[in-house]
Every structure is written in C-alpha cells, then in structure tokens.
Amino acid sequence: MDSIWGNYRRWNNLTGWFLFVFSAIVYMLTLEPTVSFWDCGEFILSAFKLQVGHPPGAPLFIMIGRIATLFAGGDVSKAALMVNILSGLCSAFAIMFLFWTITHLVRRVFLNNFQLKHF
C-alpha cells in the first residue's frame, strides 16, 4: 500500500515539474521582448517605477516585477523583457499548481466515491 502511494506521489510530482519546465520553455520561446498590446505596458511601467497600476492593480506582481527589472542591470530597454520573463514563469507555475490541484481533487472524489483501499 505504501509503495503504491509513494509511487503515485513521485509520478505526480515529476509530472507537475515536467509540465512546469515544458510550459516555461514554450513561454520563453514565444516571449515578447518589448511591450505588447493592452495592459502590458502599464504593468511593465508600474513595475519599473514601482507605481500603482490602474485599480484594482496587482501589488504583489508589481513588487515582484520590480525585483525582476533589477536584473536588467540598469538597462531600461531590457526592463520589458525581464517583466515578460517573470510573467512567463508565473504562468508556468500556475500550470504546475493547476495540475496538482486537479489531481488532488480528482483523487479525493475518486477515493470518497469508491473507497478504494489501494490508494
């Protein structure tokens, strides 16, 4: 019983991290190196200058984006690239955690409905 459960946990964790790496690679390969349409420019500027974006804003993203813009090394032209890389990594983490949430909920429903003793 423990070996089956441990095997499931291992494969679940590995699959989640694989999805993170795969989606991060896809996001990085299709990354916009400058400002794109809609609110991207406002969020990049807000992160670079550490200002408030339009309400309701995204204060945590703005603060983390400011840290990301510091990796540009003072080059203003690279600030947009750094914030876009941050957005890609955040999206990849969201995909990984969404996978883990779905597998957790499905496992809960599966175990509660069928009462299998193997899991």
Q: Where are these predicted regions, by residue range?
A:
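Transmembrane signal-anchor helices characteristic of membrane glycosylation enzymes that use polyprenol
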Residues: 9-37
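Membrane-water interface at transmembrane helix exits
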Residues: 26, 31, 65, 69, ...
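Short, Lys/Arg-rich, polar N-terminal cytosolic tail immediately upstream
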Residues: 1-10
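Extracytoplasmic catalytic/substrate-binding loops of multi-pass membrane glycan-assembly enzymes
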Residues: 31-43, 53-65, 81
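Membrane-embedded glycan-lipid processing machinery
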Residues: 68, 79-89
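Transmembrane and membrane-interface helices of multi-pass
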Residues: 21, 115-119
